[in-house]
Amino acid sequence: MFKKDRFSIRKIKGVVGSVFLGSLLMAPSVVDAATYHYVNKEIISQEAKDLIQTGKPDRNEVVYGLVYQKDQLPQTGTEASVLTAFGLLTVGSLLLIYKRKKIASVFLVGTMGLVVLPSAGAVDPVATLALASREGVVEMEGYRYVGYLSGDILKTLGLDTVLEETSAKPGEVTVVEVETPQSTTNQEQARTENQVVETEEAPKEEAPKTEESPKEEPKSEVKPTDDTLPKVEEGKEDSAEPAPVEEVGGEVESKPEEKVAVKPESQPSDKPAEESKVEQAGEPVAPRKDEQAPVEPENQPEAPEEEKAVEETPKQEESTPDTKAEETVEPKEETKTAKGTQEEGKEGQAPVQEVNPEYKVTTGTVEKSTESELDFTTEVVPDDTKYVDEEVVERQGSKGVQVTKTTYETVEVVETDKVLSTTTEVKTPVVPKVVKKGTKPVETREEVIPFATKEQEDDTLKRGTRQVAQEGVNGKKQITETYKTIRGEKTNEAPTVEETVLQAPQDEIIKKGTKGLEKPTLQWANTEKDVLKKSATASYTLTKPAGVEIKSIKLALKDKDGQLVKEVTVAENNLNATLDKLKYYQGYTLSTTMVYDRGEGEETEKLEDKQIQLDLKKVEIKNIKETSLMNVDAEGNETDKSLLSEKPTDVSQLYLRVTTHDNKVTRLAVSSVEEVVVDGKTLYKVVAKAPDLVQRRADDTLSEEYVHYFEKQLPKVNNVYYNFNELVKDMQANPMGEFKLGADLNAVNVKPAGKAYVMAKFRGTLSSVENHQYTIHNLERPLFNEAEGATLKNFNLGNVNINMPWADKVAPIGNMFKKSTLENIKVVGSVTGNNDVTGAVNKLDEANMRNVAFIGKINSLGDKGWWSGGLVSESWRSNTDSVYFDGDIVGNNSKFGGLVAKVNHGSNQWDVKQKGRLTNSVVKGTMTLKNHGQSGGLVHENYDWGWVENNISMMKVNNGEIMYGSGSIDGDPYFGFDYFKNNYYVKDVATGESTYKRSKQIQSISQAEADAKIANMGITANTFAIQDPVVNKLNRIIDRDSEYKAIQDYQETRNLAYRNLEKLQPFYNKEWIVNQGNKLTDESNLVKKTVLSVTGMKSGQFVTDLSSVDKIMIHYADGTKEEFGVSAISDSRVKQVKEYNVDDLGVVYTPNMVDKNRDSLITKVKEKLSSVALDSAEVKSITNNPASLYLEESFAEVRETLDKLVKSLLENEDHQLNSDEVAEKALLKKVEDNKAKIILALTYLNRYYGIDYDGLNFKHLMMFKPDFYGKTPSILDFLIRIGSAEKNLKGDRSLEAYREVIGGTIGKGELNGLLGYNMRLFTKYTDLNDWFIHAAKNVYVSEPETTTEDFKDKRHRIYDGLNNDVHGRMILPLLNLKKAHIFVISTYNTIAFSSFEKYGKNTEEERNAYKAEIDRVAKAQQRYLDFWSRLALPKVRNQLLKSQNSVPTPVWDNQVYVGLGGANRMGYGDGGRVVTPVRELFGPTDRWHQINWNMGAMAKIYERPWKDDQVYFMVTNMMEPFGISAFTHETTHVNDRMAYYGGDWHREGTDLEAFAQGMLQTPDKSTTNGEYGALGINMAYERKNDGEQLYNYDPEKLDSREKIDSYMKNYNESMMMLDYLEASAVIRQNLSDNSKWFKKMDKEWRTNADRNRLIGEPHQWDKLRDLTEEEKKLPIDSIDKLVENNFVTLHGMPKNGRYRTEGFDSSYQPVNMMAGVFGGNTSKSTVGSISFKHNAFRMWGYYGYENGFIPYVSNKLKGAANKENKGLLGDDFIIKKVSKNQFQNLEEWKKHWYHEVYDKAQKGFVEIEVDGVKISTYAQLQSLFEEAVSKDLAGMDDKNIKNHYQYTENLKWKIYKQLLKNTDGFSSDLFTAPQA
């Protein structure tokens, strides 16, 4: 029934057949070796069962048995299933697994010896055995684990003989049947091939005999063979003899047995039998009787031919090969067995093996003999009498017999399996069979019988595995056609056809595995990134078991959101997958999926996802402006070799100098130079490399090579030019020549002659060669400066990039073109300038421009409001026709015109429209204006008579007019709008304002109408083709604004952030920058503001080298800053770049310094700088007098810190990315050539820029980070420039030096701007005055508060005064004092300087105590100035506010120092002692002054008031009491002309000293020069009203001019009253000689004298003389006579002589207040000094300051005198004017006033007390005077009396002081009676 599933068991090469077969079915991986046995439950006795131990066996057990009990039947399968092919175990059977230390596989062999497996799902052999190997217990479905038997128990049970260590070989399974299953009726299951080998000695029984049993068996010899394992073919059966297994010791060898073909006798054999030899060891083990094959029934059909096979039946003694299929083989001889007969009723069942557990063994031997047949051979004898298909047996063959004797070992008389020896011998020889075969010809042919291919399932082979078990062999058949013959001849009858099989075909048998295959294993190997190529390659390893088919391996690339980006199929034979076009900084997921088939259908396995990200972080030079090829010779001299005409022979001397737009220079050593041809252009390819440096190629890929291309310079041919350098040089040398472009030219690396490439006035012709329109590319300056009579035509300017923000009048073609022609020119690019910036030319002067176009950008930064135009700023009588503009205009404060700003015809009315026109032109683009500036989309204006016609605008104007900019459009149309005709703007395109009336008359047209008009304008310039030079493409020259637009993940809204991050990360590539920029939040200032610089800080100080930092300061363009903490990153992963994480930003910071070892270079530079001394020749070549710089102390400091300074210098300067001795050599040469300049510059900056901002020192920032404000100059060049000239190093020019060489370089033009900016940026201060006081550590500033309300909110403080022209030189020295201690008194009019050292205040305690004295003096100075601010006329009052309106007058204390003596100019006192105030301040600023010991103080003034007017104290100390008086004196000289006299100057004929001492100087009693007690007024001192004062005691009480005038009236009238009383008392004495009391104030006509320009009558001086004899006798009866005769008292008056108001001899003379000056000595012109001062006070007292004092002392009436009095400004003219002709001379006026005073006095005055007596009446006073005069006259002749007028003078003083005191300083009424 299951015929096709029969198997036999055979011992083959020592392997039990069941093992071999099981291996085929299961094909396990042998991981351990084990032996498994079924054990019959009957063998496991009750005793043994009691010995079964529960739990798991001890792992130390070497041998043990596992006991299982079946709990269900195994599942059955299909017909092909092994389980259904053989008997099944009965339910309840036990499974005993013998286990040695290792287990290989589980093979369960059933009752009949067949292999029985659990169902496929029940036991996974590998997993199960591996588990058993580890844990000792196998869990198997269908079996229940019972327990285990130890090795000792197994021995007791007699089950240990099969378990010896050496008996089980790896892979071998020995099965013992111990169960007695029920007999089966299925004869197929009872065949002998289904018997199993028993490893224990089997009982020998005789097989039952049959009638057909042969009597004899021929013998055959058995030979050893090494045949391979037999193949089991489908449909065939193999019989196998039981293979003996030796259980104890040694290996078992097997010898082959001969295979004998078995055929039924009914079919004759036509072929000799084939022999099959099988190796066996020793003699075969005789089978038990129950193991012999039962007899097949006779009706069993014969096996088909293709299923017949050699069968071997297990024998005990004999086997008969010729036995028919239905016969049973009988043994010829019987052998005794221990149990010869089966028990009754149990036939067919396996006998039970008894176990004899004995421990002592007796061994012996037993010999057995068996006979076997030997086949005979057949001999064929040819017979030509018969046809070839006829044969006759001549003799029958007979078989031989072979006897085999085997000796076995016996144990306790029981035979064992063990074979000790085997011998064979032939008992009966073989008799060959003889057959005659016909050879008579017949027609025969042979044909091939194709073999068939059959498949057999094999569950030992992995599914999907196909294995050829038997090769197919084609058969042969013979086809015989037999013809009937007559006498040997054929007849025509059809032949008889017979087919004879000559060779049967052998089927091809293919075993098809059904066992589940191992899973293939796919693993990640690695992922290799190629960052520059934006790719990554994933590599795998694949382990694929045979038979498994890999359907696909796919790699899916997913983005961060899980979206599939791409999918790549991985080839099985190339396990690499490259993913290209990856994005940087994108987190990708790599998902790998493998689909495979193990014969069970497709299965899918996913690998663990891998994350991958390409982070490109390299060094990239960005924002490149220019790349130059530099050559350095052996001496270190640099030469620009960019304009190559041949390939350099030695690249070792070359380096690339890469300059960015912000002026940063990077140097790269050149590795190679190659001449190449690209697009027909010969170029030089220069290559450099540096660590981690990448360069962007033209195709936007990145390379690790830095390559720059230079054009090969071709020489001119005649006047045709092929290189720009040669062209501009020749045009400069020969500006009248004719020049032609023979090709496109490139201006890169060509140096301009100045502001333009050609500075000479060009008068020649420039064009392209005929029929060409060539282009000059890459202009960075205007082509021409100016031209006259020139012709420019037929060329273009391409890629223009002019960036000149400092320059006015900037245009690509040039500035001025006079009487020139410009035609057919196209300009494309960008132009930036200050004021007057255009796209073509600045001015056309009677010139013609036609068909010229500009396309690009224009940016005017200036604020002067100049004209600027899209093409032309000013067109003066010039014609601009058919021109075109399409661009973006940005203006700050300019008068822009979209095409032309000013179209100006001029005043010639006869050629209107012929000249001065703009016609047939187009303007497009945008115009963005900060200030309106009267800008227009088409023009600014067309005054006068400029003809503007047929023009079209599409300009979008923001903050300007849509067409016509100027308000003049609404002016007289005859000059303007009448000539503005047919000009249109395009509706819905052009935009802008129309704020003027006539603007609204300008019409719009549609785009279509505009296009139609434009088509007829003849404009073609805009269409001229411009091809980018190949070097532009190769060098990737792009517009700065477009630099980031092509970068991955670029966001337009983050463009500013990217620019800003370049400052934080100056080295990194653009992709990195964009990625970092996109990480910022929208609120970040890096997104919203422009960054100027980023500077590292440590502990609150700037770090200017590569030292570690803990914070960075980000400085924004709006003047703000942010500080962020940073933390160092140990490895930036970019060579030579130091990196920090920035707190709160999520980005990194890298200092703008290359991080590399510079020790050697630092040493060399330091050596060079150290060699410089201040008195060296190098320094003296810069300044003849190094000592005049006062830099000795700073120079010493610099030398002491040179190590650190040089380190900072080089780290900021040296951006050499690769090692290059050439560049280093050039650097050292530069240092050597400029070492004196460098060291002086460092010394200067160290001296003057150590400024403190709330503890933040500014010095190193100035030295090494001048890029802080946004510009990036070369540090070395910056220092060299500073140190190159003496004027840059002098302390008195610190302000100018900053402006000239520092400010413009760093981006802050003025020092004041720098200090104010820094103050706001770095400190909490908002006022520079407050900050300065705080920052100037060694300066005490006294700022007395003004009482003048109008001045309180004006600039009047210390910094206001210092930041004022000439005082600017003091700012930096004061901020940088180290040892000197200065104090400054700052008022709105003056600024006074002195030092604590001068007054011997050398300790902090002394200085602090002295500050109160400083404040006292400061208050006095302020009080004086405030007095004048109240007194001065409103029109000139603000002239006193010099701190705001001019320059405060400097006041310098003298240079005498307590304990040091007088200091010389160099700052050394007596004995050479250092005077630090001079060394640190007064010396360097040139404010030291030599002491003039002949004067107390002096003023230096100019003929006209000047900013450098100054006051110097000489002998007098500023801080002395008299110092205040001296201050009022000297400042009178400075201020009087501008403020004290209402703006009028000194009265003609007077000079300086006539106005100070004795007039406007505040008197002080500390001096003895007559000032105190003379006419005057106290404007400065605050005194007590104690009755001892001579002047107003508190100036601030007189808080208005009216009060001051009132005071002066009381002051003068009190003195006049006293004079009147004295005069009256003297007159009453009736003197016979008037000279006893009086003398004369006479006139002296002026003569030639110093400072006098008026000579002769009527120009007079005062002449004080004695009375003439006549005058002595002159009767005096009233005061009027004294007035009329100009008598003066002898007392109080100076000695006789001439008193001048000019010069320096007598003009100082004061007038004693108690002296009687009765007359006025009226002059007809100028006057003498005593009269001048006396009259001035009296005029002030009577007419007031404005109407009396000023007209008298100044030139106020000079104009009137010139008109009315022949130019004579005399007293007579003045009194007439002042009194309005009431008085004709001073004497009339004074007499009148005396009487007024007398009358008022008679009516009453303020009560006083004199010598204890109260006085309240005039009579009382008169009595006192008469007494005093009498006493004085009485002692006239007494020579012992020194003062003969003492009683009178003393009385006058007593009364005066009382009057002053009792009127509260004359601030209240002097006279008590009501005044009329």
Curated annotation (Swiss-Prot):
**Propeptide residues according to the Swiss-Prot or TrEMBL record:** 34-76
Q: Which UniProt keywords apply?
A: Cell wall, Hydrolase, Membrane, Metal-binding, Metalloprotease, Peptidoglycan-anchor, Protease, Repeat, Secreted, Signal, Transmembrane, Transmembrane helix, Zinc
Q: Tell me where it mainly resides.
A: secreted
Q: Where is this region: Disordered?
A: 172-382
What membrane topology term does the record carry? Answer: Multi-pass membrane protein; Peptidoglycan-anchor
- Residues of the active site are E1530
A single Gene Ontology molecular function, please?
A: metalloendopeptidase activity
Q: Which residues form the G5 domain?
A: 359-434, 435-516
- Protein name listed in UniProt: Zinc metalloprotease ZmpB
SMART domains, per database record: G5
Question: Where is the motif LPXTG sorting signal annotated in this sequence?
Answer: 73-77
Q: Which first-to-last residue range defines the signal peptide?
A: 1-33
InterPro entries, per this entry? G5_dom, LPXTG_anchor, Peptidase_M26_C_dom, Peptidase_M26_N_dom, Zinc_metalloprotease_ZmpB
For this protein, the Enzyme Commission number is: 3.4.24.-
- Specify the enzyme's EC class, one word: hydrolase
Annotated Basic and acidic residues bias:
201-239, 252-262, 271-292, 306-347
NCBIfam families to which the protein is assigned, alphabetical:
LPXTG_anchor (TIGR01167)
Tell me which GO cellular component terms the UniProt record holds.
Answer: extracellular region; membrane
In the record, Pentaglycyl murein peptidoglycan amidated threonine modifications are located at T76
Where along the chain is composition biased (Polar residues)? 181-196
